[in-house]
UniProtKB/Swiss-Prot annotation:
Source organism per UniProt: Escherichia coli O127:H6 (strain E2348/69 / EPEC)
Pathway involvement of the protein, from the record: Cofactor biosynthesis; iron-sulfur cluster biosynthesis
InterPro entries in UniProt: Cysteine_desulfuration_SufE (IPR023939), Fe-S_metab-assoc_dom (IPR003808)
Transmembrane segments: none
Subunit structure of this chain's protein: Homodimer. Interacts with SufS.
Active site: C51
Similarity comment: Belongs to the SufE family.
UniProt protein name: Cysteine desulfuration protein SufE
Length: 138
């Protein structure tokens, strides 16, 4: 996650974009910064149902109890949305993830109102899947 900004910098950078085209390009750029997901991690158990695009999210807990997320998608904008979600959940324990509400951050970014309904549903599916996996670990 070192290549990605923290939550506050994400919000600042997003709000600096002059228009929605710039914001979409920034989201795509964030997705390009995600580390490559191994082919063996692109498996059915890591696949997120409810997304129009193919999405894989891998969740591992490190020795300190912090969740490490990895993900990929076959769509550039969706891969960027994965990066945004990962930034919001960065350095959290499973219980932190379960308790943390990402929606106020999306509202500050005015993100969801500029996504198509299918992208918004996919974003919600990613969040539900991450929270469910975190709940199983907590």
């Amino acid at each position: 996650m070192a290549l990605l900004p923290d939550k506050e910098k994400l919000l600042r950078n997003f709000l600096r974009c002059a228009n929605w085209e710039e914001k979409y390009l920034y989201i795509i750029e964030l997705g390009q910064r995600l580390p490559e997901l191994r082919d063996e991690d692109k498996s059915p158990q890591n696949s997120i149902q409810g997304c129009q695009s193919q999405v894989w999210i891998v969740m591992r807990q490190n020795a300190q109890g912090i969740i490490e997320l990895q993900g990929d998608s076959d769509a550039a904008i969706v891969k960027g949305l994965i990066a945004v979600v990962f930034i919001l959940y960065d350095q959290m324990t499973p219980q932190d993830i379960v308790n943390f509400d990402v929606r106020p951050w999306f509202e500050k970014m005015a993100l969801t109102q500029h996504l198509t309904p299918s992208r918004s549903q996919g974003l919600e599916a990613m969040i539900r899947a991450i929270r469910a996996k975190a709940a199983a670990l907590s």
